[in-house]
């Protein structure tokens, strides 16, 4: 996977965390930068670990399905991207129903895990490709750190508008990467 695809994947994977951070930022009254950075660090750390876990799981199975690798990555990315788009169009966001209060550490960790399950599934798919998983996981984590911190800071202004559009955009990016993987396989 080339650098462009890695960066697109990283920011595509960060969109769930961005959307959750926008929602969290929207529920707080003037979130401080330190709160936004803490959220970004937690989300980024979890989002770095989950593709590594998924990659490890995928490596265990890779010798059994190596000839299907491009199809597995394609189907996973299409599925995850489609799910993100559907969630983006649904409109109901549990984060919007929380009262305006500061968010505790464990609530942030739980939210980070929930938004990073897609990254674990992508990690499974990446096990079947020629990819530097450490660099990819770090790129995903860094993108998530940036996007989650930014999401918290702008959340109070645009939470109800961009939150769902971010999921739609992230889903489209994942689908685009899936199509690119399949295209590269068939067209060299």
Curated annotation (Swiss-Prot):
An example Gene Ontology molecular-function term: manganese ion transmembrane transporter activity
Protein localization: Cell inner membrane
Primary location: membrane
Coiled-coil segments: none
Keyword Ion transport belongs to the record: yes
Keyword Manganese among record annotations: yes
Transmembrane regions: 3-23, 66-86, 106-128, 143-163, 168-188
Gene Ontology CC annotations of this record: plasma membrane
Keywords: Cell inner membrane, Cell membrane, Ion transport, Manganese, Membrane, Transmembrane, Transmembrane helix, Transport
Membrane topology qualifier: Multi-pass membrane protein
HAMAP family, per database record: MntP_pump
Biological role stated in the UniProt entry: Probably functions as a manganese efflux pump.
Similarity comment: Belongs to the MntP (TC 9.B.29) family.
Protein name per its UniProtKB record: Probable manganese efflux pump MntP
Species per Swiss-Prot/TrEMBL record: Shigella sonnei (strain Ss046)
């Amino acid at each position: 996977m080339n650098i462009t695809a890695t960066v697109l994947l990283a920011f595509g994977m960060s969109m769930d965390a961005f959307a959750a951070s926008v929602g969290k930022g929207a529920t707080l009254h003037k979130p401080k930068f330190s709160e936004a950075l803490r959220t970004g660090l937690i989300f980024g750390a979890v989002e770095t670990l989950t593709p590594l876990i998924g990659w490890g799981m995928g490596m265990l199975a890779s010798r059994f399905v190596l000839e299907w690798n491009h199809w597995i990555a394609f189907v996973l990315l299409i599925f995850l991207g489609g799910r993100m788009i559907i969630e983006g169009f649904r409109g109901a966001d549990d984060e919007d129903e929380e009262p305006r209060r500061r968010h505790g550490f464990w609530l942030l960790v739980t939210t980070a895990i929930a938004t990073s399950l897609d990254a674990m599934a992508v990690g499974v798919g990446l096990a079947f490709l020629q990819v530097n998983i450490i660099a990819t996981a770090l790129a995903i984590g860094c993108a998530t750190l940036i996007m989650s911190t930014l999401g918290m800071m702008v959340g109070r202004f645009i939470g109800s508008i961009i939150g769902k559009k971010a999921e739609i955009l992230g889903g489209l990016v994942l689908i685009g990467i899936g199509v690119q993987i399949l295209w590269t396989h068939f067209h060299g």
